[in-house]
A protein has these predicted regions:
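Flexible coil/turn and secondary-structure edge motifs
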Residues: 1-118
Length: 118
């Protein structure tokens, strides 16, 4: 099992999106934080998933398509748009998903990849 966390809107709404996906074992909702300037608490969900069933790229794409990823927000916002990684090796795949979504949508995407701290 692997973990990722996602933020971008109300954690109650985000929780249901990920719970419906095959390969997602558990979704915990609450507040997450990263390093400065994103070190304030923001609403988010922690997703535990089986990478042999659902890939990190798929989870990232679902996240980008189900909240306002193209809306600029403060990094200190309660609704910070982010993909929080638990391992450094997850960064590249998450960044590729964001770049692909930006290319497809033709819009600037304001979702950032951040290390999960708590």
């Amino acid at each position: 099992m692997e973990k990722l966390a996602f933020g971008g809107g109300c954690h109650w709404c985000t929780e249901g999106v990920f719970q419906a996906l095959r390969g997602v074992e558990k979704v915990d909702q609450g507040f997450v934080q990263s390093d400065a300037p994103a070190d304030t608490w923001a609403e988010g969900v922690i997703v535990t998933f089986d990478p042999s069933v659902i890939q990190l790229a798929t989870l990232s794409e679902v996240h980008l398509r189900t909240h306002s990823a193209t809306r600029a927000r403060s990094p200190r916002s309660k609704y910070r748009s982010a993909i929080y990684i638990f391992e450094d090796r997850q960064r590249h795949e998450a960044e590729l998903a964001i770049a692909g979504f930006a290319h497809e949508s033709g819009d600037a995407v304001h979702t950032v990849v951040l290390p999960f701290r708590s």
